[in-house]
Amino acid sequence: MRVRNRKGATELLEANPQYVVLNPLEAKAKWRDLFGNDNPIHVEVGSGKGAFVSGMAKQNPDINYIGIDIQKSVLSYALDKVLEVGVPNIKLLWVDGSDLTDYFEDGEIDRLYLNFSDPWPKKRHEKRRLTYKTFLDTFKRILPENGEIHFKTDNRGLFEYSLVSFSQYGMKLNGVWLDLHASDFEGNVMTEYEQKFSNKGQVIYRVEAEF
């Protein structure tokens, strides 16, 4: 999600350290201390403008959520939503999520969300897809044994690729939805992209994969 630079984004992020972790490298292995409890920690990579991560935090007060995005302006809009929701169980990171081992200890998080990731449709860009095997290597490290990835996309090609990638990696597919919004799945929290795509009648795909 590319957005225009937002004036004052840096100042807004820096003014809210209760939600924005300003020194993420120092947070490694200390996330439960930062949240002040031992509740499960769920991470969304590429949290965009924050509709999903803030909605999940409000819906599940006994789970801690971390939203990650590389774009400062985007994350500042996510912070707007977090401030609006006003719940304590959420943190935001302005970092590149390509190597999460920089910010999380082995087994430190309990679930990972990949929502509407860039599909990188060209074959030569396969290694940039977040469900490529090298990313799965990283995700497996920071998740516990039997940790899960919950994945949503509107891109059929990326969905099919990811199913194959998960399976070839040896992961167990605990749930596959070929049309999420037409299913009986309960508790779905939509991202901004998801709302936009669903309003246009596009099918949303979902999978839960376990290491």
Curated annotation (Swiss-Prot):
Q: Give the top-level enzyme category.
A: transferase
Detail which positions bind S-adenosyl-L-methionine.
Answer: E44, D69, D96, D118
Q: Where does substrate bind?
A: K122, D154, T191, E192, Y193, E194
| GO cellular component labels | tRNA methyltransferase complex
Which keywords does UniProt give here?
Methyltransferase, S-adenosyl-L-methionine, Transferase, tRNA processing
Reactions mediated catalytically: guanosine(46) in tRNA + S-adenosyl-L-methionine = N(7)-methylguanosine(46) in tRNA + S-adenosyl-L-homocysteine
Locate the region Interaction with RNA: 124-129
Instruction: Please indicate which superkingdom the organism of origin belongs to.
Output: Bacteria
| Entry annotation: catalytic residues | D118
Which residues, if any, are the signal sequence?
none
Among the Pfam families in the record, one is: Methyltransf_4
Q: Does the keyword Transferase apply?
A: yes
Where does this protein act, in terms of pathway? Answer: tRNA modification; N(7)-methylguanine-tRNA biosynthesis
Q: Which Gene3D superfamilies match?
A: Vaccinia Virus protein VP39
Q: According to the UniProt entry, what is the EC number of this protein?
A: 2.1.1.33
Q: Cite the CDD domains for this sequence.
A: AdoMet_MTases
Keyword tRNA processing among record annotations: yes
Write one Gene Ontology MF term. tRNA (guanine(46)-N7)-methyltransferase activity
InterPro entries tied to this protein: SAM-dependent_MTases_sf, tRNA_(Gua-N-7)_MeTrfase_Trmb, tRNA_methyltr_TrmB_bact
Q: Which family does it belong to?
A: Belongs to the class I-like SAM-binding methyltransferase superfamily. TrmB family.
Question: Function of this protein?
Answer: Catalyzes the formation of N(7)-methylguanine at position 46 (m7G46) in tRNA.
Q: Protein name, please?
A: tRNA (guanine-N(7)-)-methyltransferase
Provide the species name. Answer: Streptococcus pneumoniae serotype 4 (strain ATCC BAA-334 / TIGR4)
**Lineage of this protein's species?**
Bacteria, Bacillati, Bacillota, Bacilli, Lactobacillales
| Encoding gene, per UniProt annotation | trmB
